[in-house]
Regions:
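Helix-to-loop junctions at the C-terminal end of transmembrane segments
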Residues: 28-42, 129
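Cytoplasmic helix-loop-helix junction between adjacent transmembrane helices
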Residues: 76-116
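C-terminal ends and interior cores of transmembrane alpha-helices
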Residues: 51-66
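Helix-loop boundary and gating motifs at the non-cytosolic
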Residues: 1-27, 173-218
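Residue-level signature of mid-helix packing/kink "hotspots" within the transmembrane helices
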Residues: 23-31, 118-119, 123
């Protein structure tokens, strides 16, 4: 999104604002979507959410040349409906493996794949940008989204009902000790990563090497 908005609109302020709409809407609504998956099953939620997100991303590519308000709103929809694949897969591991040692190994492997994607993704986006333009990373993202979302959904065997496990937790997650401190730490970390992402791309563009910005982000 930062690549696209900064290139088409030539504004890193708007790029940062658009990214903020995307991120904040995801942070607010993703737990609700996850709760729906617990209640109704992964497949019942992940398939429609994936479809909505793919369409919203196409909408983002449309509004980039039109309304700024529309761009921000559709970015919020993209963030709100982007499937949190890490949560889905880790939950599936925890429900499928009873042996704690094997579960720990599986979650460790999951973290390795997750972090690898986090590093490779920006570099790949920069590579596609250099070859096919600033819209190509989002088109590639849609392809990977559909493959991952549909693949995860159709291989799911749960049918929901897991929310009943937590019926006795009436105080809310913020009432759990240390969660508030953890939340503040994660907010600070998010601000650090988000601001540095925009700054790194801005510096790369100023140096005439915008296509290398993704690689710089990955190295960071």
């Amino acid at each position: 999104i930062v690549f696209l908005v900064s290139d088409v609109r030539d504004s890193f302020a708007l790029a940062g604002l658009t990214s903020a709409f995307y991120t904040l809407s995801g942070a607010i609504l993703s737990p609700r979507v996850g709760k729906l998956a617990d209640q109704f099953g992964t497949r019942s939620v992940l398939l429609p959410v994936t479809a909505i997100n793919a369409l919203a991303t196409l909408g983002l590519l449309y509004f980039i040349n039109h309304s700024t308000i529309g761009l921000l709103l559709i970015a919020g929809l993209c963030g709100a409906t982007f499937p949190n694949f890490g949560s889905y897969t880790r939950t599936r591991w925890s429900r499928s493996i009873d042996d704690q040692k094997e579960l720990g190994s599986a979650l460790s492997l999951e973290s390795v794949f997750d972090e690898t994607a986090f590093v490779v993704g920006p570099a790949l986006a920069g590579f596609l940008l250099s070859l096919y333009g600033s819209r190509s990373p989002l088109f590639a993202g849609i392809v990977f989204l559909v493959i991952g979302g549909v693949g995860l959904a159709i291989t799911s065997t749960d049918h929901g009902g897991f929310e009943r496990i937590h019926d006795d937790h009436t105080r809310g997650i913020l009432a759990i000790p240390y969660v508030k401190s953890l939340l503040l730490s994660l907010i600070a970390l998010g601000l650090l990563f988000g601001s540095n992402f925009v700054v790194i791309i801005a510096v790369a563009k100023e140096a005439g090497r915008v296509s290398e910005g993704g690689l710089w982000v990955g190295l960071y």
